[in-house]
Amino acid sequence: VGKNGWQFEEVYEEIQQKYLQKKVHILGYLSGKSLVNLYNLAEAFVFPSVYEGFGIPPLEAMMCGCPVVASYSSSIPEVVGDSALLIDPKSAESIASAMLKIIKDEELAEKLTNKGLQQAKKFSWEKSSKELLNIFKSL
């Protein structure tokens, strides 16, 4: 889901070469409602980003009650806290292992869902703007 990013062509070529078109769906941009529906249908949200300025997609998934598997790099650990399984974004084994844990362990999936909902409550545009205003006032 989303716009074509870094190394998209290589990933797309790999999908074609390995005949994975029926298993890997490249959806492009989705509207808010469609995205929420997708999060609600998913067993997990996997976000193996190597670089991320903030980490809005994992936060969106947590807000929708979707367990998260995310990269241990960049700002993502700070955003997800202990409410996600953190993985090495360059290791297929690490990603697959975390995905299998969530799929096979309903208790873990439920725990991550509940923690994710709580973690997501810590973030809002209103809260961020108030904190920024307080910083400016203190200068």
Model-assigned labels for residue ranges:
Residues 29, 38-56, 63-67:
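Acidic donor-binding loop of glycosyltransferase active sites
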Residues 85-92, 101-106:
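Conserved acidic donor-binding segment of nucleotide-sugar-dependent glycosyltransferases
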